[in-house]
């Protein structure tokens, strides 16, 4: 392609963002990143700590045997817990939006779920009088959104988040218990392998909420039916055992503040404040609070960040471009060891996932999933292509296990879900186009590298059949306008909170890497993405718009992903070449002005819970500008030869 941009400015921008990304390493081996502080997480943590403090012990604090207590948590417990809670309440007060509500981040519009949870936290702390005007304004916002009815409407029948939110509100005496739907927690006592057959009202990764929140509802508002009442009473002890077995060493379910908080507050409210699950959950909350009194939605996305960063950098952790060494340096070897050690080698107790997958984090609360496993496979294949003679046995062994893991969770519809095969009732358990595209990329990235083509034809046939079915799923789920919708990413300025730019860019990248850029679905997707480009050259919100401040119209993340797919397709379509040039120019200007340090809240964590990750714009921009830089140099060299 002919990339008509200033190659010197491009190289300088690439160097800026690349060095910034390298400087963000938590250690020589990996990137922990930093998730946005979350009013929703902070509110649920406050509620959990307050309800635990009001529990059955004289001090309201968990009792640890000598030598068992964690030092940091113990120090906070021995001090004044109320000081932490008041600091967190002050932080929440500072985050209120002009319309009276709260959003999921400091860059998010208000939503009814977060606002109701913040209200509950204020009520439970016993300090609403000090914030009377604040609470009055928030109630006006909640009323304008439809109250409890509006909350249920937001989650469209998915009880995973709606019921825990209503439970939190009921514990704060904001909502009567009769408005909190009951959850059949007794079903958790059945064998885990049956869960996907039970038509549960929550997603596969929310069993802890099913148990704890379900028990809270049962305790505070038992069912009238004596048979149901007896059945659930008899299942309490067994399901608490399930909860105990699922809790990771860190105490944080999924390393997630909201999920852990819902479990802690629910059990504490029924007199189980000294239960080991509650004690470990409180320890997790106290260990994960930030200096300003806020909590993120999760501890970190270290594995996800690291896999993508290593791929974007092509395993070159040196300031020099290209790297001066012909073999991996010590820090590169360390990064490989770290990523290999993140692979789960045993069946996971939380979802029953088989060995072989990767989670989003290296911490104990992580659970293997398709997106992170695919990212790790892409990173490892980049290593194998760069250094085929180095650590080949270890890398190939991990890759084979990862591919087998992905093949094992492919759904019957041909698509890939996030965590578990066969859970198709609720949106966040269904197959999705972005995850399916990533799984296909992860598997296909190892073509020709495993050296098994001639000795394991059965494995190859499985891969070919899985690929065929995956492509069929993606084709069948293409939108009429040519775009694809992702599952775990959105755009808050879109009226449906959808992000077809992210989804379409991910699918187009897959089409390029699988060698099908000229397929009908790829060409339709390409035309849609070209037409979605803003006049300024970037990508961002498309379709019906709710609010659209000028500075939020385009993001570095969306522009980088879309531009990379345009660069990949530029040899096949002149419109892609023109769009790529405009996208690269937009990114150069964005990096020169420092916008790559301003992440956008495009991530979903659970259903409709927004977040941003500080490293996303840096990782995505590093990847696309590396590709653009190579294209620019190729053009310059060709011109020099002529």
Model-derived features: positions:
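Surface-exposed extracellular loop regions of Gram-negative outer-membrane beta-barrel proteins
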Residues: 279-289
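Low-complexity, glycine/proline/serine-rich flexible segments
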Residues: 22, 244-246
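An alpha-helical repeat/solenoid feature that recognizes helix-turn-helix modules
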Residues: 1-15, 30-67, 73-87, 98-136, ...
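Short, solvent-exposed interaction modules
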Residues: 93-94
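N-terminal signal-anchor module of multipass membrane proteins
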Residues: 16-29
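Intrinsically disordered, low-complexity serine/proline/glycine/threonine-rich regulatory regions
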Residues: 632-642
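Edge strands and adjacent loops of beta-rich recognition modules
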Residues: 228-244
């Amino acid at each position: 392609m002919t990339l008509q941009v200033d190659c010197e400015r491009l190289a300088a921008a690439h160097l800026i963002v690349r060095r910034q990304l390298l400087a963000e390493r938590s250690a020589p081996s990996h990137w922990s990143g930093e998730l946005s502080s979350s009013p929703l997480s902070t509110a649920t943590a406050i509620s959990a700590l307050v309800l635990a403090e009001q529990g059955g012990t004289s001090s309201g604090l968990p009792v640890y045997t000598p030598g068992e207590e964690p030092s940091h948590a113990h120090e906070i417990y021995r001090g004044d817990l109320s000081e932490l809670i008041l600091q967190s309440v002050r932080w929440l007060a500072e985050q209120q939006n002009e319309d009276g509500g709260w959003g999921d981040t400091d860059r998010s519009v208000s939503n009814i779920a977060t606002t109701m949870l913040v209200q509950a936290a204020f009520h439970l702390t016993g300090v609403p009088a000090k914030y009377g005007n604040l609470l009055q304004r928030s109630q006006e916002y909640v009323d304008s959104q439809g109250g409890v009815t509006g909350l249920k409407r937001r989650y469209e029948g998915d009880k995973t988040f709606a019921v825990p939110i209503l439970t939190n509100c009921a514990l704060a005496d904001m909502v009567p218990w009769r408005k909190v739907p009951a959850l059949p927690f007794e079903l958790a006592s059945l064998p885990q392998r049956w869960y996907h057959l039970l038509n549960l009202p929550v997603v596969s990764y929310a069993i802890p909420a099913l148990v704890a929140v379900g028990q809270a509802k049962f305790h505070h508002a038992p069912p009238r039916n004596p048979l149901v009442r007896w059945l659930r009473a008899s299942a309490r002890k067994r399901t608490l055992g399930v909860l105990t077995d699922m809790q990771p060493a860190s105490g944080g379910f999924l390393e997630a503040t909201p999920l852990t908080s819902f479990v802690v507050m629910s059990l504490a409210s029924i007199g189980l404040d000294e239960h080991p699950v509650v004690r470990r959950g409180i320890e997790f909350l106290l260990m994960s609070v930030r200096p300003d009194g806020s909590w993120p939605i999760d501890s970190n996305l270290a594995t996800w960040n690291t896999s993508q960063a290593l791929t974007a950098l092509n395993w070159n952790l040196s300031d020099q471009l290209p790297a001066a060494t012909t073999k991996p340096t010590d820090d590169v070897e360390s990064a490989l060891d770290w990523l290999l050690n993140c692979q789960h080698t045993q069946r996971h107790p939380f979802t029953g996932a088989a060995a072989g997958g990767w989670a989003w984090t290296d911490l104990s609360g992580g659970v293997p999933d398709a997106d992170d496993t695919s990212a790790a496979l892409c990173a490892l294949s980049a290593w194998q292509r760069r250094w085929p003679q180095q650590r080949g046995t270890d890398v190939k062994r991990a890759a084979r296990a990862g591919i087998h893991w992905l093949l094992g969770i492919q759904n019957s519809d041909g698509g890939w879900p996030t965590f578990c095969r066969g859970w198709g009732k609720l949106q966040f358990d269904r197959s999705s186009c972005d995850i399916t595209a990533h799984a296909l990329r992860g598997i296909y990235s190892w073509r020709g590298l495993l050296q098994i083509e001639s000795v394991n034809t059965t494995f190859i046939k499985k891969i070919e059949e899985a690929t065929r079915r995956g492509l069929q799923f993606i084709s069948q789920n293409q939108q009429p306008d040519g775009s694809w919708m992702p599952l775990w990413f959105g755009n808050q300025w879109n009226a449906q909170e959808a992000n077809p730019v992210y989804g379409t860019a991910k699918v187009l990248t897959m089409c390029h890497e699988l060698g099908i850029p000229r397929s009908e679905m790829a060409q339709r997707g390409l035309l849609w993405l070209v037409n979605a480009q803003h006049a300024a050259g970037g990508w961002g919100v498309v379709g019906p718009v709710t609010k659209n401040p000028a500075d939020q119209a385009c993001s570095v993340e969306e522009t980088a992903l879309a531009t990379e797919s345009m660069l990949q397709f530029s040899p096949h379509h002149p419109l892609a070449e023109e769009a790529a040039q405009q996208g690269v120019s937009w990114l150069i200007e964005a990096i020169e002005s420092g916008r790559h340090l301003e992440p956008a809240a495009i991530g979903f964590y659970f259903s409709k819970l927004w977040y941003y990750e500080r490293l996303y714009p840096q990782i995505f921009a590093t990847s696309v500008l590396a590709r653009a830089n190579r294209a620019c140099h190729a053009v310059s060299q060709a011109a020099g030869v002529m």
